[in-house]
């Protein structure tokens, strides 16, 4: 029995598509990294995800303020739509939640 050095990977579960057109839109490296991370996080049926700025920051290696700036740029280009969410705490108070990101088709 021959063993592989690399474990078998499920092509649907372990990979996500990054459209080729993303490289012809004039995005900088940070915007591409953020867009790719949001695609990684998205639900493929609803095209939505809700990672925090801190989580995105840890994943791509940029500060949360820089993430915010580049997300606004991606919104202006029509690649993303963001919606605020609300969270109700145990004591009944409402607080701001993470943004809900909807990935728009290219």
PLM region descriptions:
Residues 1-66, 72, 94:
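Short recognition helix of helix-turn-helix/winged-helix DNA-binding domains
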Residues 65-106:
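Winged-helix/helix-turn-helix nucleic-acid-interaction surface
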């Amino acid at each position: 029995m021959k063993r592989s050095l690399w474990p078998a990977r499920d092509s649907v579960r372990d990979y996500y598509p990054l459209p080729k057109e993303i490289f012809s839109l004039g995005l900088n490296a940070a915007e591409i990294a953020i867009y790719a991370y949001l695609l990684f996080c998205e639900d493929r049926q609803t095209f939505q995800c809700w990672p925090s700025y801190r989580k995105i920051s840890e994943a791509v290696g940029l500060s949360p303020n820089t993430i915010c700036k580049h997300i606004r740029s991606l919104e202006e280009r029509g690649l993303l739509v963001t919606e605020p969410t609300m969270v109700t705490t145990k004591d009944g108070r409402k607080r701001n939640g993470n943004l809900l990101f909807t990935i728009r088709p290219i």
